[in-house]
Structures are given as C-alpha cells and as structure tokens.
Regions:
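Short beta-strand->loop micro-motif that forms the acidic, two-metal-ion catalytic signature
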Residues: 41-44
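Catalytic core of pol beta-like nucleotidyltransferases
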Residues: 1-24, 30-36, 47-99
Length: 99
C-alpha cells in the first residue's frame, strides 16, 4: 500500500514543474486510516499562473504516478465552508513547499 512517504516523494518531484507554492495532504492518508480504496486528498496553494487546464493536467500526472485517484482543493482556507475547513485543518500535513 502507498505510504505518506511515497506520496511526499512523488509530490516533491512533480510540483516543481507547476505554479504551486505549497501542498498539504489531508483526509485518510494524513490521518493514517486509509484503505485500499482511499483517494488522496491534497490542498494546494497555487500561484496566479495556475489555470484549470493546468490543474487538470497536474491531477492526471499525480494519479498516474501514485496509482490512485487524487482530489485537489485550491480554495484558500478562508474561502471554504467552516465545517469543511475545520475538517481539513484538523489533519492536514504540509508535504511540499516551493523553494
């Protein structure tokens, strides 16, 4: 089964090719209670040049390299519904920061 370290390695190799400043893992993989069917949940802090098309390409590349469905959230926390933001903030882990 894929691990947090595996996800971090792939994300750290892929994201430098995109306008992403930070990536946070949340959900079951961040909590350590993932199942064989779990998807990978990421919250990305993107730069201004990130388009929906590029974001779609990024998600496909991550899914191919990780062998799992990847759900990406790009809204800043202050723009999220409070209940959703709280659930993310409880377990999110920063797994990438652009240099």
């Amino acid at each position: 089964m894929i691990s947090l370290a595996d996800i971090t390695t792939v994300v750290s190799r892929v994201l430098p090719h995109y306008d992403v400043r930070q990536a946070y893992l949340f959900g079951s993989f961040a909590r350590g209670d993932q199942t064989p069917d779990s998807d990978i949940d990421l919250r990305l802090a993107c730069g201004d040049s990130m388009t929906f098309g590029t974001l779609y390409e990024l998600s496909l590349e991550l899914e191919e390299k990780l062998g799992r469905k990847v759900d990406i959230v790009t809204n800043p926390p202050e723009h999220m519904r409070q209940a959703f933001r709280k659930s993310i903030e409880q377990d999110e882990v920063c797994i990438y920061e652009a240099s």
